[in-house]
């Protein structure tokens, strides 16, 4: 039995991604599988932020080519940049934290209540989708006061600027087929 536990420990991944608590919080299913696929395709952060590989594109064609290739190559890294910007926005806005706490608190209360018995409102049983819509309706004034709309557009704008500038100015390694192309004389 002890040998089996040692084998399980050896089979577990090591490093930063192994110590992340997020995958343990997400139940198994499609969401967890998607997160695992994203984590598996993350490119090395050292090459992602290597300052020696940034330069201005020579022309519009090269700019477009860099945008397409970098977005395709660093797609998972860009997803985590987006999530980091969301986290930054939420952490730096205390009222938005309160609004999120109200929303998730209402969802949790509804969840606990449905475990005990069916949720009945005005003599009618309320479906789970309607319950979460009710939680959203209760927390909507808090989101409105917190300026959640402007936070959403800030995150989208900041994401476009950060990812767009990185994709436009980051040089990709030359692919073997591109090195062998001949220029017309």
UniProtKB/Swiss-Prot annotation:
Keywords in alphabetical order: Cell membrane, Cytoplasm, Cytoplasmic vesicle, Golgi apparatus, Membrane, Synapse, Transmembrane, Transmembrane helix
Chain positions covered by the region annotation Required for interaction with GDI1: 165-185
Required for interaction with prenylated RAB3A and VAMP2: annotated span: 30-54, 175-185
Record's bilayer topology term: Multi-pass membrane protein
GO CC annotations, alphabetized: Golgi apparatus; plasma membrane; synaptic vesicle
Main function: General Rab protein regulator required for vesicle formation from the Golgi complex. May control vesicle docking and fusion by mediating the action of Rab GTPases to the SNARE complexes. In addition it inhibits the removal of Rab GTPases from the membrane by GDI1.
Protein name: Prenylated Rab acceptor protein 1
Species for this entry: Canis lupus familiaris (Dog)
Gene that this polypeptide is encoded by: RABAC1
């Amino acid at each position: 039995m002890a040998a089996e536990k040692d084998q399980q420990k050896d089979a577990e991944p090591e490093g930063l991604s192994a110590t992340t608590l997020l995958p343990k919080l997400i139940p198994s299913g499609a969401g967890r599988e998607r997160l695992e696929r994203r984590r598996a395709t993350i490119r090395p952060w050292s090459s992602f932020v290597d300052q020696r590989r940034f330069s201005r594109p020579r022309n519009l064609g090269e700019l477009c080519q860099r945008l397409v290739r970098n977005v395709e190559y660093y797609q998972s890294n860009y997803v985590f940049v987006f999530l980091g910007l969301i986290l930054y926005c939420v952490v730096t806005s205390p009222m938005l934290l309160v609004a999120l706490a109200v929303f998730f608190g209402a969802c949790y209360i509804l969840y606990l209540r449905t475990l005990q018995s069916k949720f009945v409102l005005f003599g009618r049983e309320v479906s789970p989708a309607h319950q979460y819509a009710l939680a959203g309706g209760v927390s909507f004034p808090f989101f409105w006061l917190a300026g959640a709309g402007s936070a959403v557009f800030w995150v989208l704008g900041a994401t476009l600027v950060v990812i767009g500038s990185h994709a436009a100015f980051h040089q990709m390694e030359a692919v073997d087929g591109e090195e062998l192309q001949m220029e017309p004389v």
